[in-house]
Amino acid sequence: MKFVDEAFVRVEAGNGGHGCLSFRREKFIPRGGPDGGDGGDGGSVYFVADKSVNTLVEFRYQRLLRAQNGQPGMGRLRSGKKGEDLIVPVPLGTTVYDKETSELIGDLIEAGDKLCVARGGRHGLGNTHFKSSTNRAPRRTTSGEEGEARELKLELKLLADVGLLGLPNAGKSTFIHAVSKATPKIADYPFTTLYPHLGVVRVEEYRSFVIADIPGLIEGASEGAGLGVQFLKHLERTQLLLHIVDIAPLDGSDPVQSIQAIISELEQFSQNLSQKPRWLVFNKIDLLAPDVAQARCQEIINRLNWKGPVYKISAIKRQGTELLCYDLMSFLETNQRSI
């Protein structure tokens, strides 16, 4: 299924049913009085977070979501049937905005979270309500109210504990494949990963976390170079970023400049994202002699004046990945997840 993380949709709640103008008519009761029933309330439109839904692609084909109208009231004090609510499943991590005002309407995080995005109109009143000591045969009723209608923007931000950063071909997809059951496409050309991938990393039977891989960034991504920064939003809910660095790039590029380019793109996209905890992960150490790999890693650390955690791994050979995953689990358990 195609991955879609943004959609626009119009929602229309049902109108309330009109009140009924009716009088009791029975044999031997010539003046039975009013017996008009109320209309039914209009149905509302709800979004519900559903863990079986992974993308907003359905909204590309269904741009109008409409709940049922309430039915009009009837004689003999019978109320009209309420319009049926429209319940629409959306992925966990869906944020809903008013398209015109950009107002945040709600965030659906946990399975079962429910958000009313258009409320149904109230029912109209039958003429029974307007009977009084001075008006025994009222001919007054009220109309049902119109249901709410609005244009919405839906945005999906994946729910993950750890996010992967790096240039194309840094080895992010290989890493997530090595430590989880995720199966992203892996090859030796740029932009193999075209859409975000999630993987569940289990360090023990009951200890696990979710890791997100997004398409690689390149310098100028904020201006639209490469695949741009459109997928960075999927890292905004993470607790920690792993910056995967290729220490043996085939094109001979400078890893320090590559790291600085990624940091620059992060800062231009979001200060909040750029300030998240970030660990450096030097990948592909198996391609260099141990002493050369050690010297190159230390040179990068010195030039960056890096003070944070550093790991040296070979994702393809699963070298150093187990320790990294256990340390990630410990970090996440110490710093309880907050979205």
UniProtKB/Swiss-Prot annotation:
Cofactor requirements of the protein: Mg(2+)
Transmembrane segments: none
GO cellular component, one term: cytoplasm
Database matches in InterPro entries: G_OBG, GTP-bd, GTP-bd_Obg/CgtA, GTP1-OBG_CS, GTP1_OBG_dom, GTP1_OBG_dom_sf, OBG_GTPase, P-loop_NTPase
Keywords: Cytoplasm, GTP-binding, Hydrolase, Magnesium, Metal-binding, Nucleotide-binding
Segments forming domain Obg: 1-159
Binding positions (GTP): 166-173, 191-195, 213-216, 283-286, 314-316
Enzyme class label: hydrolase
Keyword Phosphoprotein tagged: no
Binding site residues for Mg(2+): S173, T193
Annotated localization: Cytoplasm
E.C. no: 3.6.5.-
GO molecular function: GTP binding; GTPase activity; magnesium ion binding
Annotated ranges, domain OBG-type G: 160-333
Highest taxon above the source species: Bacteria
Region (Disordered): 127-147
GO terms, biological process: ribosome biogenesis
Gene3D superfamilies documented for this protein: GTP1/OBG domain, P-loop containing nucleotide triphosphate hydrolases
Similarity comment: family membership: Belongs to the TRAFAC class OBG-HflX-like GTPase superfamily. OBG GTPase family.
Stored HAMAP family: GTPase_Obg
Function: An essential GTPase which binds GTP, GDP and possibly (p)ppGpp with moderate affinity, with high nucleotide exchange rates and a fairly low GTP hydrolysis rate. Plays a role in control of the cell cycle, stress response, ribosome biogenesis and in those bacteria that undergo differentiation, in morphogenesis control.
Oligomeric form and interacting partners: Monomer.
Protein name (record): GTPase Obg
Organism: Coxiella burnetii (strain CbuK_Q154) (Coxiella burnetii (strain Q154))
Gene symbol of the encoding locus: obg
